Amino acid sequence: MINNQTQEALYLDFDRARWAELRNSVPLTLSEADLTRLRGINERISLSEVTDIYLPLSRLLNLIVGARQQRGLVLNQFLGNKQPDSPYVISIAGSVAVGKSTTARILQALLKQWPEHPKVDLVTTDGFLYPLTELKRKGLLQRKGFPESYDTKMLIDFVSAVKSGAERVEVPLYSHIIYDRLPYERQVIQKPDILILEGLNVLQTGLDSPVDIRRPFVSDFVDFSIYVDADESLLKSWYIERFLQFRSSAFADENSYFRHYASLNDTQATETASQIWDGINGPNLRMNIQPTRERAHLILRKGADHLMNRVLLRK
């Protein structure tokens, strides 16, 4: 990570045991059945992980959102009129295979249990990837997941509309089976209390842009940002494990874009996944994703077996 002196200046550093103490009797509202539904492929997250890591985090976020709501009341009093309600936007960034989606789903399930903000929506940025035909036209198919492969204008228009209090905003849905947007399906967002936005590049700013530093970025609309972190050696091994599991699930689907991978043996599948990581996911991590890590308000650090072993919280 960053050097120790800079890290100490920017972050409060908690090991797992110290962080777990900050739960402060927040009740566990998820069952093992709930967790089975929420966890992703190749995730071994347990209820103890929820208790030790996610309950303290949900408590922190509840306090922060409450403070924002109080600030809104102060602003209304100062202006002499009620401003439109604006959702609190939480972004979750990190590498492919780090478990961002599982983190986002668990946080959504926990945050909606608090009576102060029961409506919590989750949107992934996958739906804002350019359609396959457009990626092929632009020569970006091998750069899918890199910043330039996203329809950034559509993404910014969406976040801006939600943040402005729009009554109804539609979001493109993405299918990992067909490896493309679903042309006739949309997710509808209707004035949530909290919006969780999960994706590879949601911490990016103009300093990182290969396109145009003058345009707004998703990070400009985010109130609290989380980065899920792990060593690249672990990330690559998790990606390969997930790829092997997909052979008998997603890849085996007759509509799968990657159906040709379903017949690979273990050696072939491992070699293929390793090549994909080395050619696409690894470079994207090092060039675009990891450099944004220290902009996050909170870093969740994973060790072996996907277990969080460290939490860094911005001072």
From Swiss-Prot:
Gene Ontology cellular-component terms listed: cytoplasm
**Listed pathway(s):** Cofactor biosynthesis; coenzyme A biosynthesis; CoA from (R)-pantothenate: step 1/5
Provide the catalytic activity annotation: (R)-pantothenate + ATP = (R)-4'-phosphopantothenate + ADP + H(+)
- A Pfam short name: PRK
Judging by the UniProt lineage, the source's domain of life is: Bacteria
Among the record's GO biological process terms, what is one?
coenzyme A biosynthetic process
UniProt-listed CDD domains: PanK (cd02025)
InterPro entries xrefs: P-loop_NTPase, PanK, PRK/URK
Which UniProt keywords are present, listed alphabetically? ATP-binding, Coenzyme A biosynthesis, Cytoplasm, Kinase, Nucleotide-binding, Transferase
Q: What is its main location?
A: cytoplasm
| MF GO annotations | ATP binding; pantothenate kinase activity
E.C. number(s) listed in UniProt: 2.7.1.33
UniProt subcellular location:
Cytoplasm
Secretion signal span: none
HAMAP family from the xrefs? Pantothen_kinase_1
| Name under which the protein is recorded | Pantothenate kinase
UniProt source species:
Shewanella amazonensis (strain ATCC BAA-1098 / SB2B)
Lineage of the species this protein comes from: Bacteria, Pseudomonadati, Pseudomonadota, Gammaproteobacteria, Alteromonadales
